[in-house]
Design a protein with these regions (language model features):
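Short gly/ser-rich loop at a beta-strand->alpha-helix junction or flexible surface loop bordering the NTP-binding
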Residues: 1-189
């Protein structure tokens, strides 16, 4: 059981939840024992980390993705940052999730929705929206046209966004969002 938990936690940058622990067959009393012996560290309510797990640059993202569960994905400005698209310098960690518990911290910006498998990719311990989904999310959000232009131009330049795929997507977008995407595409050609 310990090996199964270690495998699961390592896939999540060392993080795991109370729910995961109990599903693997640990007793509630085991949690206290592992905290007392120092092998587990309590991070937040119902969120723990293996003490000896190596640190990562993706740790803050992994922590919150683990806390919200398998349906959570890094999105919007945070996804753009991780993809290297634009210079948005987000003040919050943006997550898309179907869960609706209140945010446990003010450092999160939650976007409540479900994402299809074609809209996310696995990057190390994280689920993250694809560059295309990220650009579309940003076009629908409140970022400036100049910043959106930069995100789209960077994505096209490094081959992570297809201008033709974004153009095709415009037909199914609300009018104002489609116009913003079209302007961004025009700015990068």
């Amino acid at each position: 059981v310990v090996e199964e938990l270690t495998r699961a936690a390592m896939a999540q940058a060392g993080y795991f939840t109370t729910t995961q622990v109990l599903r693997l067959g640990f007793a509630a009393s085991d949690i206290g024992e592992h905290l007392a012996d120092g092998s587990w560290v309590k991070i937040e309510r119902d969120l723990f980390r293996l003490r000896d797990c190596p640190r990562s640059d993706l740790e803050e993202f992994a922590k919150w993705c683990t806390w919200f569960g398998a349906a959570a994905a890094v999105s919007h400005q945070s996804a753009a940052e991780l993809h290297g698209l634009g210079h948005l310098y987000p003040r919050f960690i943006h997550l898309s999730t179907v869960l609706s518990p209140p945010s446990p911290t003010q450092q999160l910006a939650l976007h409540r929705r479900s994402l299809g498998p074609e809209e996310v990719e696995q990057v190390g311990p994280l689920r993250i929206t694809t560059p295309k989904r990220t650009a579309l999310d940003l076009a629908a959000s409140g970022i400036s046209q100049e910043l959106l232009d930069e995100v789209v131009a960077d994505g096209v330049a490094i081959g992570r966004l297809s201008a033709s795929a974004l153009q095709r997507e415009c037909g199914s977008l609300p009018g104002q969002v489609a116009q913003r995407v079209e302007r961004a595409l025009a700015a990068c050609t």
